[in-house]
A protein has these predicted regions:
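Carbohydrate-associated surface elements
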Residues: 54
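A short, conserved, highly charged catalytic patch centered on acidic carboxylates
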Residues: 1-48, 57-86
């Protein structure tokens, strides 16, 4: 089931490359919350995901084929995201 993303960033060709999921500040971004969001967003086929509650932020690079993800140390810049390379 596909739903509207909170924020969806596109590359220069209009392809989606980053989804940002925004939670309320009082919602803690636990491993369970993050896992639910990343699994849900595999349906978009987007290589990057950010989850934030406005206080805490997590970024990940997804591997759609393997249905896995790698947490990143920081949110990548736009040029990195559109290269679609690790």
């Amino acid at each position: 089931m596909l739903r509207r993303a909170d924020i969806l960033v596109h590359d220069r060709d209009g392809e989606p490359v980053l989804i940002v999921e925004c939670k309320a500040p009082q919602v803690k971004i636990t491993q369970e919350v993050f896992d639910q969001i990343i699994n849900y967003n595999f349906s978009y086929g987007v290589p990057y995901l950010v989850v934030t509650n406005g206080i805490t932020h997590f970024a990940a690079r997804t591997d759609i084929a393997k249905r896995s993800f790698e947490l990143l140390d920081s949110i990548p810049d736009y040029e990195t995201i559109i290269r679609r390379e690790p």
